[in-house]
């Protein structure tokens, strides 16, 4: 989970908090409290007869069997026939204990693994090939998935909490996160002006505290700064990624998926049941962005999105029918009504 934030169980600031992150604390919010470093994603390549490949989803906690499963899927060399060499001069890894973690092997991020087929061992079945790996190998690869959170007007806050806390689903966090955002905005009326917020600073703070309002780009930007991480939102309608905090130099990245009206968190699941899902990624892990776009494209092809310019809404206060977010915005401006439901 994200550790350095102070004042509450997930980072609500104490009284008098200015909204700015002290320079001395930069870099502490993205790792666990205490001396144990965060388990970051490794960048490891493997070189085999067919070329050089980047391996996905590895860390010090990855088990050798998962590494060999990836290599098998990429190279077509079955785990039992692999020879893996590392270092200079290259030395063979001991592959006898397939449950050992990479952190206990002489491998580190940035290494190039040389993979060869051990000719002294029985060859794999002809059915085992680079593009036809057996199902057990395909299943051994980590997969990026979405986790559904309640559609209760606070899905953004629940989703952000889920990813920064390492996979904790707690919809009850929303009021606290809303108060956090209001306190940060109120602390800097110059930065968070009416031109930015679309309403006065005071009105915005009252508005965001309510449980019937939706979060969006402003709130994501604030949470990105507070948690000192890049928040990437992949849009299933346009199949694009909006990256908040991209240029801030953060070392961590979390991902949400957005269908036009609802946010869900994304996580990487591993086949080993003892390996917890990963929700916090290295900002250098661009593979996870590709995987997120693949998820979004699949959802778009299945039309799992809401066109916010054409969807039908009803004002839950006066029951007036509306079409699209523009009409809803105009209605809210004219009447002060902000509680809408999709028809």
From Swiss-Prot:
Subcellular location, record wording: Cytoplasm
Catalytic-site annotation from UniProt: 152, 155, 262, 337
Positions of the UniProt region annotated as His-loop: 258-262
Predominant cellular place of this UniProt entry's protein: cytoplasm
UBX-like: annotated segments: 45-123
Binding site for substrate: 261
GO cellular component: cytoplasm
Domain of life per record: Eukaryota
Role this protein plays: Hydrolase that can remove conjugated ubiquitin from proteins and participates in endoplasmic reticulum-associated degradation (ERAD) for misfolded lumenal proteins. May act by triming the ubiquitin chain on the associated substrate to facilitate their threading through the VCP/p97 pore. Ubiquitin moieties on substrates may present a steric impediment to the threading process when the substrate is transferred to the VCP pore and threaded through VCP's axial channel. Mediates deubiquitination of 'Lys-27'-, 'Lys-29'- and 'Lys-33'-linked polyubiquitin chains.
Protein name stated in the entry: Ubiquitin thioesterase OTU1
Source taxonomy: Eukaryota, Metazoa, Chordata, Craniata, Vertebrata
């Amino acid at each position: 989970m994200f550790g350095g934030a102070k004042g509450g169980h997930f980072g609500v600031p104490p009284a008098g908090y200015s909204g700015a992150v002290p320079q001395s604390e930069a870099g502490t919010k993205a790792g666990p409290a205490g001396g144990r470093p965060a388990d970051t994603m490794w960048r490891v390549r493997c070189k085999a007869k067919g070329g050089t490949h980047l391996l996905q989803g590895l860390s010090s906690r990855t088990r050798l069997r998962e590494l060999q499963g990836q290599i098998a899927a990429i190279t077509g060399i079955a785990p039992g026939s692999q020879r893996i060499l590392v270092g200079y001069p290259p030395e063979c890894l001991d592959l006898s204990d397939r449950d050992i973690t990479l952190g206990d092997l002489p491998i580190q991020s940035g290494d190039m693994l040389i993979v060869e087929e051990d000719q002294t061992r029985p060859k794999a079945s002809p059915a085992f090939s680079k593009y036809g790996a057996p199902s057990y190998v395909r299943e051994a690869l980590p997969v990026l998935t979405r986790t559904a959170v309640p559609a209760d007007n606070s899905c953004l806050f629940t989703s952000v909490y889920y990813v920064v806390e390492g996979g904790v689903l707690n919809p009850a966090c929303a009021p606290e996160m809303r108060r956090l955002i209001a306190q940060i905005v109120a602390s800097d009326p110059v930065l968070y002006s009416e031109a930015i917020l679309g309403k006065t600073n005071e009105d915005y703070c009252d508005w965001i505290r309510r449980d019937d309002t939706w979060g969006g780009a402003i709130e994501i930007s604030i949470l990105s700064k507070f948690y000192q991480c890049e928040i990437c939102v992949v849009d299933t309608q346009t199949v694009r990624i909006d990256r908040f905090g991209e240029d801030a130099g953060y070392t961590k990245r979390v991902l949400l998926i957005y269908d036009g009206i609802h946010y869900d968190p994304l996580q990487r699941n591993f086949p080993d049941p003892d390996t917890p899902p990963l929700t916090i990624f290295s900002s250098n892990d661009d593979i996870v962005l590709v995987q997120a776009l693949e998820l979004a494209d699949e959802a778009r092809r299945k039309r799992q999105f809401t066109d916010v310019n054409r969807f039908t809404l009803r004002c839950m206060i006066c029951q007036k029918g509306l079409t699209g977010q523009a009409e809803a915005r105009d209605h809210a401006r004219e009447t002060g009504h902000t509680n809408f439901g999709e028809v």
